[in-house]
Amino acid sequence: MTTYKEINGTDIEVVASDPSNPLVGEVWYNTTTQKLKGYRQVIGNAWSTGGNMGTKRFNGGGAGTQTAALAFGGFTEPASTVNTEKYDGSTWTEVNNMNTARREFASNGTQTSALGYGGQTPPGDRVAVTESWNGTSWTEVADLNLARRQLAGAGVSNTSALAFGGETPAAGQVGNTEVWNGSSWTEVNNLNSNRNNLAGLGTATSALGVGGDPGTSANTQNWNGTSWFEVNDLNTGRNGASAAGTTAAGLVFGGTSTVKTALTETWNGSQWSETNDMNTARNQMGGAGTQTAALGFGGEPPPTGTTTEEWNAGITVGAWVTGGSLNTARNYIAGTGTQTAALAFG
């Protein structure tokens, strides 16, 4: 039977107090507590509080990563805003404003290359306006073919985007889908079902449209660059949710089910799984990041908030569970066996 020394090259260390910074897999005997201990890896997923935004808002745009995000536009009560802020992982800083104040628009991109399109301007007009962010300022570019609000978007920069779904006064909920190539929008195949208030994630050639209205839908559709096809539904239907990630590794959080929710679900390319909730239930917040490192900011609890939450999924380090003490304290011992049938000698 293989011993600890044969695996690690050393005997089990005997100490009076636990190491302050043990290595993963390290084992030691604490003579003070008379406990044999070790260190292991624990998989953990959790939301934590980030820095507050300077301007409270909901129905705004979001782009970027957890440590380099952009928040822009939205509704600040009692009016829409042009305010733009960037996030460095701890603090929000105001930068140059958008040209057109609006809410309920779609967005995508990074902190230095973002796009905002569609939405609603006072006193309730649906717009097709598209603005491009270059890391310093906003510039108006070519309009959407269909003016609408409450649409979703996907894309990695201000030169590549997908706009889908939404609502117009004439048609109500729509399934219209348009692709942005950096200079113009082109109409392509529609969603399989007309929806508004849905969440979007992914790229212009590989995207997900998730949830939305009518009702509080759980429907999920996948865009393959040519057409939409239905995939497995969310576990909890909702509208007004936020999203991050890709079609292979996605994240949806918040929104409204029967009430505003903190529920978070992960997507593995084929199905949704529930995971740990946000700290604050809310909808219509900005979102950014990836499945393992996401950001949710602003939103409507109510009242409208400035709160930022950071999602981290990965490996954290924690202590092993302590077992029973040896009958005789000793050092330089050998051991063999299994966790439930072990032998210590020498």
Regions found by a protein language model. Name each.
Residues 1-346:
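Polar, enzyme-active/binding microenvironments
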